[in-house]
Amino acid sequence: MYSLFRPLLFTCDTERAHDISLCTLDIAYHSGALPLLTRHPRPLPTTAFGLNFPNPVGLAAGLDKNGTHIDALFALGFGFIEIGTTTPRPQPGNPKPRLFRLTQQQAVINRMGFNNLGVDALVRNVAGARQRNGPLGINIGKNKDTPNEQASNDYRYCLERVYALADYVTINLSSPNTAGLRALQEEQTLRRLIGELREAQETLAAKHGRHVPMLIKMAPDLSDSDIDAAARVLNEMSVDGVIATNTTVTRPLLRQHRLASETGGLSGAPLLGQSTLVLRRLRTHLPETIALIGVGGICCGADAVAKMAAGANLVQCYTGLIFKGPQLVGECVEAIRRRREASSSGRASTQ
């Protein structure tokens, strides 16, 4: 069904197509027509950072920034949903146009700039959601006009606001579209910031009587030494998990494309190799107690398996959905299932 809808959708401006897709999804969900769009995957139970997931394939942050489509998105068969990025105060994001589709390359360049209605609006929307068929993650960031020296105040405020409703919280330090944000990944700055947020997490856990996992979302553009330094901090601070990775400011395989010079983060197929290398290096330097979510460039089941082979416990997709449609969810679940079954058969044959 999506293959019939996509050509019409791709005649629209990219950001308008995004809005139309979400509106259509909601209509299909509320009318009961959603089964015509996709087939729900069979369960593939997975456990990570103390949470149980019906399957290991989730939706990355960015599609539903304000938590207004939670019910419909879960109905597509995702094992978990991550909403946001949300900030303490509403902000409009960067001027339009700010979203560019590279159809042949199955890629997108965005410079959205954390456009959202603010954390209070998101909290109201989450409280009103009725269908949560898996864990709900909430991705939090700082406002554009908040200096890095005060960034911890923004993250702590959002953490306090969403803690009671989130199954896990992601600290977004890696969007390239908020000036200076990625500087928060520098070793000493990262250590101070995570230290403050871990203290807040422990205080909130005592207040609410439950531990909500805190994950850190990393950039793909770090050098090996920067990745290793970040891994040291993440291990020292005993974070619950890491998401690898966000979008890239480099342009792998796109140097001749007419949109390659557009400012912003690149996602989609060209990001797969780069993001998977970061994932693999993090897995090498982090203990198994710190779970990893692999995201970046997943456009088919084989891509999801590549993330798992590199050390991911879970995977997320977003840009691939634009080109493949919601059937990508089931394709990834089934590919990971086959990998698990093959691995189990291999172990059994050696015993």
Curated annotation (Swiss-Prot):
Q: Keyword set for this entry?
A: Cell membrane, Flavoprotein, FMN, Membrane, Oxidoreductase, Pyrimidine biosynthesis
A Pfam family in this protein? Answer: DHO_dh
Write down the EC number: 1.3.5.2
**Which reactions is this enzyme annotated as catalysing?**
(S)-dihydroorotate + a quinone = orotate + a quinol
The family classification in the record reads: Belongs to the dihydroorotate dehydrogenase family. Type 2 subfamily.
Active site as annotated: S175
Q: Where in the cell is it found?
A: Cell membrane
Keyword Flavoprotein carried by entry: yes
Q: Which organism is it from?
A: Xylella fastidiosa (strain 9a5c)
Q: Which domain of life is it from?
A: Bacteria
Cross-referenced InterPro entries = Aldolase_TIM (IPR013785), DHO_dehydrogenase (IPR050074), Dihydroorotate_DH_1_2 (IPR012135), Dihydroorotate_DH_2 (IPR005719), Dihydroorotate_DH_cat (IPR005720), Dihydroorotate_DH_CS (IPR001295)
Q: Where, in this chain's numbering, is FMN bound?
A: A61, G62, L63, D64, K65, T85, N139, N172, K217, T245, G268, G297, Y318, T319
What gene is this protein a product of? pyrD
Q: Which GO terms describe its cellular component?
A: cytoplasm; plasma membrane
What is one GO biological process annotated to this record? Answer: 'de novo' UMP biosynthetic process
Keyword hit for Amino-acid biosynthesis: no
What does the subunit comment say?
A: Monomer.
The protein depicted here goes by the name Dihydroorotate dehydrogenase (quinone)
Cofactor note as given: Binds 1 FMN per subunit.
Q: How does it sit in the membrane?
A: Peripheral membrane protein
